[in-house]
């Protein structure tokens, strides 16, 4: 489709209609994890992506236990990025360890992990160590560029950094970021819809794709330009 902002020529137009759950997914080339070491490190990954929410995007005000983390993620309206997993044989299905999603007028980021070998049945609503880490205003009518740096680990040595339009707006180190599984995870993104019959009949966003990197990569390599200086970092509203 033509870029609605008139900046980038042809871009991907992602639409989902009258379904919950619904999916319009971009599957970036999967970087193989470095393999689980004794400490549980699965390797470091970088992910750049850019999306555009149209000006006529209808804000869907959530109904339910607003602010309750256990409610937020399962009832998120639209997911735009996830770091997915491959559960061990005999293990229960997991929520993605990292999710970015629309919730009302906010773009939220949540993390879940499990250091134990057997995770609970998350389909029953038991999400281990779920944290809604941060949120930003949902911007419509403008391209937003994101970069996520993730060191995948179920030990206390993981890394999570999130850049928004070149600014480092969230950083946490020395924390678990994944499940205690044999296989590592992978990025998926696009538009995923969860909710109820009261939601809008269709949803559309525009997307410029993904650039992925491994432990040898950097912000500049995946984003194509340097990050802004730390002095330019804004506080998150």
Where are the language model's segments positioned?
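Low-complexity, Ser/Thr/Pro/Gly-rich disordered linker/stalk regions
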Residues: 1-236
């Amino acid at each position: 489709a033509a870029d609605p902002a008139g900046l980038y020529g042809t871009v991907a137009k992602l639409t989902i209609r009258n379904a919950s759950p619904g999916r319009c997914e971009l599957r970036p080339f999967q970087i193989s994890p470095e393999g689980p070491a004794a400490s549980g490190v699965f390797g470091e990954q970088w992910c750049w992506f850019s999306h555009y929410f149209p000006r006529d995007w209808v804000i869907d005000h959530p109904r339910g236990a607003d602010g309750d983390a256990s409610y937020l993620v399962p009832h998120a309206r639209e997911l735009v990025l996830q770091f997915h997993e491959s559960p061990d044989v005999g293990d229960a299905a997991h929520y993605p360890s990292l999710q970015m999603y629309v919730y009302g007028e906010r773009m939220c980021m949540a993390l879940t992990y499990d250091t134990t070998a057997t995770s609970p049945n998350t389909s029953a609503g038991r999400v281990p160590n779920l944290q809604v880490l941060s949120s930003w205003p949902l911007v419509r009518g403008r391209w937003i560029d994101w970069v996520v740096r993730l060191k995948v680990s179920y030990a206390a040595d993981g890394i999570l950094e999130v850049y928004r339009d070149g600014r480092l707006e969230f950083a946490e180190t020395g924390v678990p970021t994944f499940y205690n599984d044999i296989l590592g995870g992978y990025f998926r993104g696009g538009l995923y819809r969860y909710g109820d019959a009261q939601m809008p009949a269709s949803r559309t966003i525009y997307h410029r794709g993904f650039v992925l990197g491994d432990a040898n990569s950097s912000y500049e390599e995946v984003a194509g330009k340097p990050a802004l200086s730390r002095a330019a970092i804004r506080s998150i509203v």
